[in-house]
Amino acid sequence: MLRKGDLTQGGITGTLLHFTLPMMVGSLLQQCYNIADTLIVGQCIGAGALAAVGSAYTLMVFLISVLLGLTMGSGTVFSLHYGAGNHVALRRSIFSSFVLIGIVTLILNVAVFIWIDPILQLLQVPQDIYGMMHSYLWIIFCGIVFTFIYNFYASLLRAVGDSVTPLWFLAVSVVLNIALDLFFILQLDWGIQGAAAATVLAQGVAALGIIIYTYRRRPELRWHHEDMCFDRTCLKEIASFSTLTCIQQSVMNLGILMVQGLVNSFGTAVMAAFAAAVKIDSFAYMPVQEFGNAFSTFIAQNFGAGRYDRIHRGVRSAFVTAVVFSLLVSVLVFVFAEPLMLIFVRPDETEIIAVGVAYLRIEGAFYCGIGILFLLYGYYRAIRMPGMSVVLTVLSLGTRVVLSYWFASIPEIGVTGIWWSIPIGWLIADVVGIWCYRYVKGVRGS
């Protein structure tokens, strides 16, 4: 009998796409949290506020990368237990990981409130936007617990094959976020603080909704009194996946943050262009990123069930799908780069538009590289080799950072060199990851 959310049965391509589609839509909606702030702030307040929100978002993603890494790693453990049909181990891992990530969230919150000023100074944030960025981050981290709760339960539901429910709660949250943005900024004139408050309140609604749904509608995922213990084997398994995934996310976002610091040194105009272009860039490749996350769940369930033949066929299907989709998006971004920038920037800000268009056309040409890399990350996490995902991340981000600083120091290249360093890092990591896959495939029979 086919279990609800079982990815070990049925047609591979259809199963993957059916599971992925709600995740893709949900991920695009997730981007709307920050894009709504960026669009309304950029059009209603100005370029300085746009630069502040964009730079704050990059820092925020880096700081919560620990939480995201822990939830992603825990999600892989949940998928393995669900695929193997071990519900006792599943419930115990849910309890243990929830407590662990909750403690980390509290520590992170305290750390941010203590060290927010030294961090902003280290990033060379210009004085004209320093106050706005400080206020925005302070409010956002007051509600970081909502980010933890929503992402934890969304990861849990996706791990057991339910990618639709998180989408519904996220959709309600995004609509509320946009409505509150308009109300707080246009009606109450709260400025950038209003944008941050809108995001926190909207995330709170999503968090409350998803936790109530899980406890009422999915009793098999509700831990019991006997599950509320820190089993050594369970904790070791969670730590094995979560720690390395956490390191991967931290390294990834540290590299991005270092590049952000370099971009900041070129002034407010380049910062604003980068902020707007990165939102478009993230929006463009986010579907294939979620496809990689869905692919990881698919591989983990089949690995737990011992379906190695299905894993091999799934790899081929996923790579073809990712490449075709990435090529289509590359063409669209290249052609419509300037109109896309005008969504966030006023037409008279020509310097910002020109810098942003250059970024998008360089990045957009190489979306196949990042699409393949997301699949490789997901594959290695799912087959109990999360360390390989870390290696690929270090390769990709290390190349990006080194080349960014080198190219930017050459006057003839300047800021454009930063844009070129990003796809070069993707392609180098792809080559290494594919070569290692051929070896692992032979050894593990997958």
Residue ranges of each PLM-predicted region?
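Short alpha-helical transmembrane segments in multi-pass integral membrane proteins
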Residues: M1-T20, F78-G143, Q187-T243, I299-F366, ...
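Transmembrane helical elements of multi-pass membrane transporters/channels
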Residues: H18-D37, I139, Y150, S173, ...
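Generic alpha-helical transmembrane segments of integral inner-membrane proteins
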Residues: M24, L28, C32, A36, ...
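Residue-level signal for short hydrophobic patches within transmembrane helices
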Residues: Q9, T13-C32, A36, L59, ...
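Small-residue-rich hydrophobic transmembrane alpha-helices
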Residues: L50-V110, T147-P166, A273-A337, I370-R384, ...
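Small-residue hotspots at the loop-to-helix junctions and early N-terminal turns
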Residues: A47-T58, L137, A196, T268-F283, ...
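Short runs within selected transmembrane alpha-helices of multi-pass transporters and secretion channels
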Residues: T71, I139-R158, P166-V174, A195-I210, ...
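Helix-terminus/linker motif at the lipid-water interface of multi-pass membrane proteins
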Residues: L28, C32-L50, L120-Q127, F183-W190, ...
